[in-house]
């Protein structure tokens, strides 16, 4: 393929930028965005479904960054882990899973405890409470001491909903004398993914030591109430010990999150050789398993092994002899690389990656710009070098600031991204570069509930798709009623590369 004859494509993913005509709680509607408004009015555009069955999730289940980027890269609808695991519970295959029974048998033989760790909510983004309930059923069968280490959500759910989910678990374990809730911890601590090891360490110590944040009360609901009285929401609950059952030699440990990126640091604190995050305890003969593969470099058995995926967009670009660049800040780096490539860690031949560090702050509403300006400068530099035929860039701002629930900061973040788009447009103005602007899911478009309470979770609204090709501005029409699965076939169509049979998405170009 003659690379010089190709019009380079820039795929710009505005993370968390949904489309809604409802102005209430809509930071995108409230923001001053003259650039993207002009593009929407003057270039071919359509709306894409980014939630539910359109991205391999249950009906009306909100999309998320992992699923969104996987679907964009796949060019097909893939049944996501949430669906696969829930289906296995429904058809009872879950209760015959070899790896789970292996874990429980090990603890029976060693007369030790089984520890279950994961996000306790019905958010469905990283985990699901029904999967935890199914594990507790297996615990009843084996009658081994089972310790629950519950991570509270408040991000993919309402900010103060943890008591509802914990109560559901209490109702189950009241019938099961050998199961106890041993720790709680907000996901801010247990699910950091930006190497803020001081947060992970606090969660780790609650699980392995008696010295961490003990409570005189063993009533977990009262403990949560006390935190609420201090205006501490679920996401930020300090790691707290409820029962004195530590993780010790010969114990077993099950991680039930199915999405790996935010639980990986906590896993590493137990399992990674030559771990350097903080000083950890020596725990011998610890048997580990994870619901899905969290880290391919660790030989940890999984309950639901990865299914082989081939002919993702990045692989096809590479096989066609084209060069590509993936560009994101820390918070979304895994999404434009690992997830976009179908769970493959290593870059494809001809694929370069650039990571811009996210700011080290408590919450991202403190600097709504995050690293958007640095990202934009790197993108402009890459465009000017004329090395790449395909560039993927992710702007994290709408999603990450949207998750804070801070409306004013989110509006500012949206306006900053709009300014960055303007700089990119000036750069490609007199070139043959093609810019595609889209998103992976909604968030900043829905920040207030019907009860006027802050909403920090994603929305199920569609996302925009704008095709900016100055050489064919008036000649291109786009299909309506598309989905994220149609983006990769559209890009291959523009590049005049055959769309593989594995891609069941369709080109959006009519």
UniProtKB/Swiss-Prot annotation:
Biological processes, Gene Ontology terms: glucose catabolic process; glycolytic process
GO cellular component annotations of the record: chloroplast; cytosol
EC number in record: 5.4.2.12
UniProt cofactor note: Binds 2 manganese ions per subunit.
Coiled-coil spans in chain: none
Keywords recorded for this protein, A-Z: Chloroplast, Glycolysis, Isomerase, Manganese, Metal-binding, Plastid
Positions with a binding annotation for Mn(2+) 1: 399, 403, 458
Residues annotated as binding Mn(2+) 2: 15, 65, 440-441
Predominant location category: plastid
Sequence positions that bind substrate: 126, 155-156, 187, 193, 259-262, 332
HAMAP family: GpmI (MF_01038)
Protein name as annotated: 2,3-bisphosphoglycerate-independent phosphoglycerate mutase
Lineage: Eukaryota, Rhodophyta, Florideophyceae, Rhodymeniophycidae, Ceramiales
């Amino acid at each position: 393929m003659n690379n010089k004859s190709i019009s380079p494509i820039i795929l710009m993913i505005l993370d968390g930028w949904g489309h809604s005509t409802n102005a209430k709680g809509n930071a995108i509607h409230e923001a001053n965005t003259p650039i993207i408004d002009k593009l929407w009015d003057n270039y071919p555009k359509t709306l894409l479904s980014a939630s539910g069955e359109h991205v391999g999730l249950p009906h009306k289940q909100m999309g998320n960054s992992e699923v969104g980027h996987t679907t964009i890269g796949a060019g097909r609808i893939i049944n996501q882990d949430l669906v696969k695991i829930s289906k296995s519970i429904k058809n009872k295959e879950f209760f015959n899973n070899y790896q789970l029974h292996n874990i429980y048998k090990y603890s029976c033989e060693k007369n030790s405890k089984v520890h279950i760790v994961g996000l306790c909510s019905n958010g469905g983004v990283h985990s699901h409470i029904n999967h935890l309930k199914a594990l507790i059923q297996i615990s009843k069968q084996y009658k081994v001491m089972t310790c629950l280490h519950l991570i509270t959500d408040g991000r993919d759910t309402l900010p103060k909903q943890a008591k509802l989910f914990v109560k559901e678990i209490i109702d189950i374990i009241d019938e099961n004398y050998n199961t106890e809730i041993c720790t709680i911890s907000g996901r801010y601590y247990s699910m950091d993914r930006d190497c803020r090891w001081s947060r992970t360490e606090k969660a780790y110590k609650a699980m392995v030591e008696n010295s961490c944040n003990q409570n005189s009360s063993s009533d977990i609901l009262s403990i949560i109430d006390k935190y609420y009285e201090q205006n501490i929401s679920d996401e930020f609950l300090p790691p707290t010990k409820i029962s004195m059952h530590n993780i010790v030699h010969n114990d077993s440990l099950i991680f039930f999150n199915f999405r790996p990126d935010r639980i990986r640091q906590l896993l590493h604190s137990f399992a990674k050789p030559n771990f350097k995050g903080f000083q950890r305890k020596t725990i011998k003969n610890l048997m580990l398993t994870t619901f899905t593969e969290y880290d391919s470099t660790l030989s940890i058995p999984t309950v639901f092994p990865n299914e082989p995926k081939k002919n993702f967009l990045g692989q096809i670009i590479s096989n066609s002899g084209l060069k590509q660049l993936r560009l994101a800040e820390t918070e979304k780096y895994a999404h434009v690389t690992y997830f976009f490539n179908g769970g493959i860690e290593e870059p494809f031949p001809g694929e370069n990656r650039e990571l811009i560090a996210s700011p080290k702050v408590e919450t991202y509403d403190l600097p709504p710009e995050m690293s958007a300006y640095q990202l934009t400068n790197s993108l402009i530099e890459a465009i000017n070098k004329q090395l790449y035929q395909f560039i993927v860039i992710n702007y994290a701002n709408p999603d990450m600031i949207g998750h804070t629930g801070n409306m004013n900061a989110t509006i500012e973040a949206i306006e900053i991204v709009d300014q960055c788009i303007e700089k990119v447009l000036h750069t490609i103005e007199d070139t043959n570069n093609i810019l595609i602007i889209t998103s992976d899911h909604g968030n900043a478009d829905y920040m207030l509930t019907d009860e006027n309470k802050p909403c920090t979770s994603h929305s199920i609204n569609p996302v925009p798709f704008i095709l900016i090709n100055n050489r064919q501005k008036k000649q291109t029409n786009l299909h309506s009623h598309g989905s994220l699965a149609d983006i990769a076939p559209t890009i291959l169509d523009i590049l005049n590369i055959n769309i593989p049979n594995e891609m069941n998405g369709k080109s959006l170009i009519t």
